[in-house]
Structure formats: structure tokens, C-alpha cells
Swiss-Prot record:
It comes from Fervidobacterium nodosum (strain ATCC 35602 / DSM 5306 / Rt17-B1). Residues 194-229 form the UVR domain. This is UvrABC system protein C. Pfam families: GIY-YIG, UVR, UvrC_RNaseH_dom. It is found in: Cytoplasm. The keyword Cytoplasm applies. PROSITE patterns: GIY_YIG, UVR, UVRC. CDD domains: GIY-YIG_UvrC_Cho. The gene is uvrC.
Length: 563
């Protein structure tokens, strides 16, 4: 428990404060007046504040110039460290983003979360819309999508030959011009869709003036495709304005994102907090796309303060059109709350919709992962009554098998020869993977004891032995299956990476002077990668293997990392 005296040296300035227990972040907060806010935590007689102070053994503060800096840092740290006493935004489905990397010559990609560095635009509700928008922008602006180190490239990739990349890697376009182009893409992703329309029309006219009608026709087709993509989202405002509508109740919040008059996203989150806290957290975690205005049901003093800090306008609906949109958002929120059912009801729905033999109280999910056919592994995750059971997870090493179907057959046979089958076996993949699992169950005489289904990644289509089933992206049954799929994928990929890095480290250690079998074993028991060894102090390694061996080890690893 922390002593009240720790507050004596803390100034009454803006900043972020961090309660820690050992190395674990248990609560992160921000304050305009740090000392005043922390004093209220320490004086609390009950509730969360009392628990935090009693559990923490360390308190750190970061002083900042103003409340806005504190707000943004707090949100980013909460997102990164996920302290247990901070309320978190919980996605009710997997939303795609478009990420622009931090490289000197950035590449763009569609991602399913905000992990890693770079600028994230979105989230978008509709996967199809996101892909179509990305492809149109790619054809227009010809940005790179490859992740290779372009400073070492001598030949362009296939995208260049297909006219999808400008060839900045081989100096076909200057870095300066490329960066200007990326800034244009950023503006479009912030909702300035008229920019891309003007750009396409300009290119079309330029080619027509040069009597290059073939390329003029290409840009005409791109423009038609772009208009079709945008029209699929529906025009909700006659003016090209960028606004959001935020409504919430019963620990559920909904955000309508309107860009250039188009409704491009309907986002739903579970969050145990007030609308002020939700808006603060949501917009400080999505700083790349903050609208001109946020419409809410009711204004209050706290919302005005957040608006001032973020430099945006938060207000009630001002006319009939905005009021109609607000009511539409409220109707959608009520619908979403109705969809957030208990796990029991979701599982009952799953049984009925998928035609399962029994209620899927126990679901086991399998995924295969490998690196170019090497270090093939399988993950098996367990969900009981819709909840994760991490303690029952299993991981399997499969050697260098190239065939995913064969890998699935091996794992299913190995697992269920010795263990009872679950109510439902979930496979990350399509009909081929589902059939492989079913045939393996048939070999051991258990095919009648459980159902087997898969989830095809492209359009989140549910695959059964009898056909395909498509559900709305926000349907609770699909949300649960996506959650299982993502968990199997995460566990399998994590296992593959760990095996790969350890195998790589093992082979490197074999070549280093002064590192024999005994020292090699000591290092492998303690560290899993080159990066991990280079991140610790020299003295720590010297205590394990001695000074000479440490010198030789660090020199070799540093050299290899810089290759």
C-alpha cells in the first residue's frame, strides 16, 4: 500500500499519473492538477480508488504542458498497457482500419486492429467498402503496399508492372512527390472525398487532351467505380460535411461516422463508463480522424470541457436533419443493445441457425500456422459457455508439413483419440479444412459426436459440411465465431514466432566463439530471441556466461542485427 507522504513532492500541474504493482500497470489517469486529483484517490474511503491505492506499490507521474497533451498520452498508455482498473473500449465486432506506415517511404495496408506503429484511419464497419475504397485509391495514387526494405531493391515488384505502384523504389518518382501524394490519400481518408474525384477528373482530362483515350477511359472507369462505392454507403446529408453522432446507454455506445455527407461507419462498443469518458477515450485513440463536429443527445459542462481540450465542437442536433440522424442513431443503439444477448441465448441461436446436433456449450477451435512450410504448428483454443478457457489451450508442433489439410487431420486425430470431442469443433478455414477435420473424426469413429464448422476469412462466411451460411457482420453468433477464429489465429501465430526466433537463436549460438553446449543451454533457457538478449544489461549476461563469452556474444548479435 502506498504512503500518503508520496504526494508531498508531486506538483499541482497538468500530467499523467500511473499506479503500478511491481511491473504491472494497474491504473492510469490524467489531471489538470495532479496533486489535487491524487489526493482524492488517497482519501477515498471505499470504491475503486481505495482498491487502487491499497494494491499499488509505486506511483509515477509524467508532467505535461497542458491538459490536451495529458489526455492524449493517457489514452495511448491505456490502449498500450490495458490496466485492469481502467475501463476499456470493447469492440463488439472486428473493425478494419487502413494503416499508413511510419517508414520514410510509407506503405499502406488494411488491418484488423490498431496494433503497431503508423497512422490508422477508420475504423470502418463494412469490410467490402474498405477493400473497394483501398483499391480505388491504389489505382489513383499508386502508393506502395509491399513491406520490403526499398533502399536495397534494384528491381521493382509486380505492382509496378501492373500500374498499381509508381516505382518510387527505383526512383521513377521522387520521395518528395510520393509524400505529397500520401498526404492527399490522408485527406481522402479523413473524409475529403471530393479531392479524389477532382484528381481523377484532372487525370482524365489530361489524357484526353493528349489524345490518349485509352488511359482517359481507364480513369473514367475508376471514377465510375469510386462513385459506385460511395453510393453504396448512402447519402445522409446534402452538404459535404464531416460529423459524428455519439449515443449510449446500458454500457453500450454507438458512433455514426459521416464523411462528405456519406455514412461510412456504424461502430458499436461496450464500455462501462459515462458518455464523456467514452468520447474522451475514443477520440484520443483515433486522432487521425477527428470530425468537425460531434452531435450528442444532451450537452453538459464536462462535454464542453472535452471539446475545448480536443479542439472540436460537441453539440446537440441543431436542425431537423441532424435530429433525424440522431434519432436514427438512437434506434440503431436500441437494436444493438437487443443484439448483445447473454451467451446462453447466443449459443441457442447458434444451434438453431447452424443446425447443430446439440447446444455448443463447449467449442474447441483449431488453426494451423507456419513460416514458408517450416515450423508448422497448430493451436487449440477452448470456449465454454461462450467464455475463453485459457488454461485448457494446447499447442502442437508438426514439423515441416506443407499441407494444411494434412496438418488438420493429424491434430484432430491426435487430440480426439485421447480426449472427448467438444460440442462443436471450429476450424479456421473453408470447406477443405472442414472436410479434413471431419474425415479425421470419421477415422476414429467420432464423426457423429460433434459438428464441424469453419469460417472463410474473405467475407466471414460460415462453412458447414452441408453448405455456406452468411450472417450480418454485427450478428452475435458471427461475432462469437470471429472471436474464436481470431483467438486461434493469435495463439498459432504467437507459437510460430516463438519457435522461429528460438530456432534462429539456437543456430546462431552454435557459431559463436566461447559459447559451448552448457552456455548455449543456459542462454536458451533464459532468452528467446536476439532482441531480448540485446535489451538486457551486459552485467546480467556476464553473470550467466562470463565476460569473454558475453563480449563475443554481444559483438556477434549486434553485427547480425545491423546487417
Amino acid at each position: 500500500m502506498l504512503d500518503f507522504k508520496i504526494l508531498e513532492k508531486i506538483p499541482n500541474k497538468s500530467g499523467v499519473y500511473i499506479f503500478k504493482k511491481g511491473e504491472e500497470y494497474i491504473y492510469i489517469g490524467k489531471a489538470k492538477e495532479l496533486k489535487k486529483r491524487l489526493t482524492s484517490h488517497f482519501k477515498a474511503k471505499d470504491g475503486k480508488s481505495k482498491l487502487i491505492v491499497e494494491e499499488a506499490d509505486d506511483l509515477q507521474v509524467i508532467l505535461l504542458d497542458n491538459e490536451k497533451e495529458a489526455l492524449i498520452l493517457e489514452a495511448n498508455m491505456i490502449y498500450k498497457y490495458k490496466p485492469k482498473y481502467n475501463a476499456m473500449l470493447k469492440d463488439t465486432q472486428v473493425y478494419p482500419y487502413i494503416r499508413i506506415s511510419n517508414d520514410e517511404i510509407p506503405y499502406l495496408e488494411i488491418v484488423r486492429n490498431r496494433k503497431g506503429e503508423g497512422e490508422f484511419y477508420g475504423p470502418f464497419t463494412n469490410v467490402y467498402f474498405t477493400r473497394q475504397l483501398f483499391e480505388v485509391l491504389r489505382k489513383v495514387y499508386k502508393f506502395r503496399t509491399c513491406k520490403r526494405d526499398i533502399t536495397k531493391l534494384k528491381k521493382p515488384c509486380m505492382d509496378y508492372h501492373l500500374g498499381l505502384c509508381s516505382g518510387v523504389c527505383i526512383n521513377e518518382e521522387s520521395p518528395e512527390d510520393y509524400k505529397k501524394k500520401i498526404n492527399e490519400v490522408k485527406n481522402v481518408l479523413k473524409g475529403k472525398f471530393s479531392n479524389v474525384i477532382s484528381f481523377i477528373k484532372l487525370k482524365m482530362e489530361q489524357h484526353a487532351r493528349l489524345l490518349d483515350f485509352e488511359n482517359a477511359a481507364k480513369y473514367r472507369d475508376i471514377l465510375l467505380n469510386f462513385n459506385k462505392v460511395m453510393e453504396s454507403q448512402g447519402v445522409v446529408l446534402p452538404e459535404s460535411v464531416n460529423i459524428d453522432l455519439v449515443v449510449g446507454k446500458h454500457k453500450t455506445f454507438l458512433v455514426f461516422k459521416i464523411r462528405s455527407g456519406y455514412l461510412i461507419s456504424k461502430l458499436v462498443y461496450e464500455y462501462d463508463g459515462h458518455i464523456v469518458d467514452f468520447i474522451e477515450l475514443f477520440y484520443t485513440q483515433n486522432t487521425s480522424d477527428i470530425p468537425e463536429k460531434i452531435i450528442v443527445e444532451k450537452e453538459n459542462k464536462e462535454l464542453k470541457n472535452i471539446a475545448k481540450i480536443l479542439g472540436i465542437k460537441i453539440a446537440q442536433a441543431k436542425d431537423d436533419l441532424e435530429l433525424q440522424l440522431l434519432n436514427k442513431a438512437i434506434d440503431n443503439l436500441n437494436y444493438e443493445i437487443g443484439l448483445i444477448l447473454t451467451n446462453k441465448i447466443i449459443l441457442k441461436q447458434m444451434k438453431e441457425l447452424l443446425g447443430l446436433m446439440k447446444l455448443p456449450n463447449r467449442i474447441e477451435g483449431i488453426d494451423i500456422s507456419h513460416l514458408a512450410g517450416k515450423n508448422t504448428v497448430a493451436s487449440l483454443v477452448v470456449f465454454e459457455n461462450g467464455e475463453i478457457k485459457k488454461e485448457e489451450y494446447r499447442r502442437y508442433k508438426l514439423g515441416d508439413i506443407l499441407d494444411d489439410f494434412e496438418s488438420i487431420r493429424i491434430v484432430v486425430k491426435k487430440r480426439y483419440t485421447k480426449h472427448n470431442v467438444p460440442d462443436l469443433l471450429f476450424i479456421d478455414g473453408g470447406i477443405g479444412q472442414v472436410n479434413a477435420a471431419y474425415q479425421s473424426l470419421k477415422e476414429i469413429g467420432k464423426e457423429r459426436e460433434c459438428d464441424v464448422i469453419g469460417l472463410a476469412k474473405e467475407e466471414e462466411t460460415i462453412v458447414t459440411l452441408h453448405g455456406e451460411i452468411r450472417l450480418a457482420f454485427d450478428h452475435p453468433v458471427l461475432r462469437l465465431l470471429v472471436k474464436i477464429r481470431d483467438e486461434t489465429h493469435r495463439v498459432a501465430n504467437e507459437f510460430t514466432r516463438n519457435l522461429s526466433t528460438k530456432k534462429s537463436l539456437r543456430s546462431i549460438l552454435d557459431e559463436i566463439k566461447w559459447i559451448g553446449p552448457k552456455r548455449k543451454k543456459t542462454l536458451l533457457e533464459r532468452y528467446t530471441s536476439i532482441e531480448e538478449i540485446l535489451s538486457v544489461s551486459r552485467s546480467e549476461i556476464e553473470q550467466l556466461i562470463g565476460k569473454k563469452a558475453t563480449e563475443s556474444l554481444l559483438n556477434e548479435l549486434s553485427y547480425r542485427r545491423n546487417l
